Regions:
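Short solvent-exposed loop/turn micro-motifs enriched in small/polar/acidic residues
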Residues: 1, 46-48, 112-114
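N-terminal beta-strand motif that seeds the catalytic metal site of vicinal oxygen chelate
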Residues: 1-18, 23-33, 85-92, 135-142
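Core segments of cupin and vicinal oxygen chelate
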Residues: 9-59, 97
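Vicinal oxygen chelate
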Residues: 30-32, 62, 90, 96-142
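A cross-kingdom feature marking solvent-exposed beta-strand/loop segments within repeated
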Residues: 36-39, 71-75, 110
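A short helix-loop-beta-strand connector motif used in the catalytic cores of GNAT acetyltransferases and
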Residues: 47-51, 84, 116-117
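Active-site-proximal beta-strand elements of phosphoester/diester hydrolases
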Residues: 64-66
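Long, charged/polar, surface-exposed segments that mediate recognition or autoinhibition
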Residues: 76, 81
Length: 142
């Protein structure tokens, strides 16, 4: 077995897609799932309006999905102490460039301890993302 993708429910597919493209993701597939199939898979009442965009970055696939027939409810932003998936972590070559891409594509830097090691950002719809310099490495002392 292997992981296929991680799905992220969004309100505005194209706005969020542009944000992740600014961080190096590329679109590999876009689809509209027929209501009957979506109803059977998701247990939602028709009409569903299931649209998805699959984005890829270095082998990782992120599915952005929306359901026009079932608007997303207003919810508090998830944080690191809530149960369940907390964030997506993206390795970056240059922290300053990545932070600039976040800001210019509608996101926000929400925590930055300095030093260029890692920071936390939110996408245009509030999803928490960790930017980490290159690959996982020991946390700096101090």
């Amino acid at each position: 077995m292997s992981i296929s993708h991680v799905g992220l429910r969004v309100r505005d597919l194209d706005t969020v897609k542009k944000f992740y493209e600014a961080l190096g993701f590329t679109e590999v597939q876009r689809m509209t799932v027929p209501d009957k199939m979506a109803a059977g898979l998701l247990g939602l009442a028709e009409p569903i309006g299931f649209e998805a965009v699959y984005l890829q970055n270095d082998g990782f696939v992120l599915q952005l999905l929306t359901f026009s027939g079932h608007p997303a409810p207003d919810e508090a932003q998830r944080n690191m102490v809530g149960a369940g998936l907390t964030h997506i972590s993206i390795a970056v070559d240059d922290m300053a460039d990545a932070q600039a891409a976040v800001r210019s594509s509608g996101g926000a830097v929400v925590a930055d301890p300095g030093g260029g090691f890692a920071c936390m950002v939110r996408d245009p719809e509030g999803q928490l993302i960790e930017l980490i310099h290159m690959t996982v490495r020991p946390v700096p002392a101090g």
